[in-house]
Amino acid sequence: MHNSPAAAAPKSFDLTSTAFLIVAFLTGIAGALQTPTLSIFLTDEVHARPGMVGFFFTGSAVIGIIVSQFLAGRSDKKGDRKKLIVFCCVLGMLACVLFAWNRNYFILLFIGVFLSSFGSTANPQMFALAREHADRTGREAVMFSSILRAQVSLAWVIGPPLAYALAMGFSFTVMYLSAAVAFIVCGVMVWFFLPSMRKDAPLATGTLEAPRRNRRDTLLLFVICTLMWGTNSLYIINMPLFIINELHLPEKLAGVMMGTAAGLEIPTMLIAGYFAKRLGKRLLMCIAVVAGLCFYVGMLLAHAPATLLGLQLLNAIYIGILGGIGMLYFQDLMPGQAGSATTLYTNTIRVGWIIAGSLAGIAAEIWNYHAVFWFALVMIVATMFCLARIKDV
């Protein structure tokens, strides 16, 4: 991927590309080992009520936004994302160790979540580094990013079933220590194999900047992605408890459902990346929203394991297109601001968690877990309204 003699090009190209793929997978697996079981961990191990579970997700998202915005400002100013990613991996590993051995709700919320926020920021910083690397080496950024996103989805194929197997078959301690190992290996890979890409002084920015262009459309896209990720967060928080406590189905089904959706997301992301220039990002996002609408209607009606698994195709289209195209949409609306654009996109995920944590906790506390899917349906309808007003790029 570097400009080098022909004889050396294949080796350099393969090494750098493989390193990015492995790091994308490892950052994905570290998250996929923790997030799917977190609501069950808080309920069964920490003994938190539904409202406290929702508040935990909300607080986690708020702290995550503060941390990621701070790191985005430093990364766009300093430009050396490699050391920053390694630093994030180290703190992510420490967070996993804390969750493995501690069961105090407030220690986990204020210290564990603070450390976890740095760990989760390793992923968007890796994508920002990949975008800059693709731009400087002339690689097709859309397809390269889609392939990396597919690696994260591959991690989510393996991660949720493995997380449930480790947590239910052994213990949550074993599960979190496994995630810590993933962070350690990821940090080593980044340090030795990813390129350092310092920015020149004229390109440096003093703070995390607002979009220089397309501000209205960037705001609309922020709302759209926030609502879409919010529905997905509602699903992740609520679905395992809904499956176990209301449908009385096996615990492992929740992990299989998440893994199935992630597996189907991989071809969805690659296809979306291929057709992004031909069909436009806006049309692809519209397709995703329609699939999401059908999915959440299905979740309100379905109760059989086979039907729940079949619905994951719609979920995969919904999240696969959002995950593969949403970040690129931000980057195209904010040219020259790769770090800020990527972090802004990532913060739509975190704001989605804020909304979802509050709604899931309140709905489950007052009504039941099934009622949460009605809130998701309303958010999908609001997304359609916003999507009709944004321009294509």
Curated annotation (Swiss-Prot):
Residue ranges of the TM segments: 13-33, 52-72, 84-101, 105-124, 152-172, 174-194, 219-239, 253-273, 283-303, 308-328, 344-364, 366-386
GO CC terms in record: plasma membrane
Pfam families for this protein: MFS_1
Signal peptide bounds: none
Protein's cellular compartments: Cell inner membrane
Annotated membrane topology: Multi-pass membrane protein
Keywords: Cell inner membrane, Cell membrane, Membrane, Sugar transport, Transmembrane, Transmembrane helix, Transport
Record GO biological process: cellular response to glucose-phosphate stress; D-glucose transmembrane transport; lactose transport
GO molecular function, one term: carbohydrate:proton symporter activity
Family under the similarity heading: Belongs to the major facilitator superfamily. Set transporter family.
Function statement: Involved in the efflux of sugars. The physiological role may be the detoxification of non-metabolizable sugar analogs. Can transport lactose and glucose.
Protein's UniProt name: Sugar efflux transporter B
Gene from which the chain derives: setB
